Amino acid sequence: MLNEPVSGSISNYLTTTHHAAVIYGEGVSFYYVEPPEKESLTYLGLLVFVLLNQAWFMGALFLVAGYFTPGSYERRGAGAFLKGRLLRLGVPLIVWVFVLNPLASIGLYLEPVPRIPGSLTWEAYPHLLGLGPLWFVALLLIFDAGYAAWRMLPQQRTPTPPRPPSQPTYASIVLFILGLTLSSYLLRIIVPIGQPVNLMLPFLSFPSLAYFPQYLSFFVVGMVAYRRNWLQTMPGSMGIVGVVAAVVAFVLLFPLAFFGGLGGQFLGGGHWQSAVYALWDSIMAVGLCLGMITLFRRFLNGSGGVGQFLAQHSYMVYLIHSLVLVGLAVALRDIELANMFKFGLIVGIGVPLCFVVAAIIRRVPLVARFV
C-alpha cells in the first residue's frame, strides 16, 4: 500500500528542488530569483525540469491526500475530522499568510535586479500577504470540507465498507486521460498556465488553477483507490506501462507543444499547442503516478527510524522551505558561480537544512499539535 512517510518526504524533496530551479532557471515566480542564463543549457535544463515537475507532482500530492481522507473521516467522525483539518491546515495557513509569507517576500527586495523598487517599509505589509506555496493547503482544506459535506448527506452517512479488491483497467485509464486532457484544455482557454486567480481577497491568489481538473480528479481517484484497494491489487506491469507511456509522451508530445517557439501558445488560449500540452501533461501525470505507486509498494514500503523522522517533520518542511531557500539564495547571491552550480548547492544544503530547522521548530511547545 501507499507509504505516507516515504511519499511525504519525496514530495517535499520535489517541492524544494522545484522552487530552487525556479530561483535560478525560470526567473519570475518566486520570492527571490536571479536573472536566468537564457540561451544556455542551464536555462533550458532547469526550465524543462520545472515543467516536468509541474505536470505531475502536485497532482500526486492530491492523490495521496485523497487516499488517506476516507479512513481519517471514518475513524474520527464528521466533527472531529473537520476540527482536525481546521487545526492542521487552517491554523498553519493563517500563520503563513500573515507572518511567514511577508517574511519570505523580503527576498523580492534583495534580488540582484529587484522586482519591487524602493525600500521595505511597514506600508508594504498588506501587499506582502499571500498564499504562496500554501495554496496547496488552502485547496486541500476546501476539498476536505467538500468531502465532509458530501459524507453528511443523508444517503452517505452510513460508513462505506471497503469493496472487494479490484484493479483499474487500461480502458478506464485511457478514458480518464482523455477526459482530463479535454477539461484541462477547456479551462486553460480562460485560465492559462501561470495566470494566478484571486478568490474574494487579493492575497488569496492561486497560482496554478489551470491544473484544477488534475488536482480535483486525482483527489477523487485517491479516495476511490482507497475504497477499491487499487494500490494493493494494481499489477506491477501497469506501473511499467505508465512510465513507458510518460517517456513516449515526453519524447513525442512535449517538443510538439512548443512548435513555433516559446511564445506561450502551449499555455492556453485555445491554441492547438495547448491541446497537445494538455494531453502530454495528462499522460505524464497518470503514467508517473502509476509508476510511483508500484515503486513505493515494491521497494519503499518500510518506515524505519529515518522514515518516521521524515514523516514527523515533512509538513513543517513544506511550510518553511521557501524561507530556507530564500535565505540560502541571498547568501549565495554575491558568489561568482554559474546558476547550475548554485542550484546544486541550494538543493544539497537546503533539503537537509529544512528538516533540521523543522525538527527544531517542532520542539517549541504546542507547535507539533498543528504541524
Model regions and ranges:
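Alpha-helical transmembrane segments and their immediate juxtamembrane cytosolic regions
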Residues: 1-371
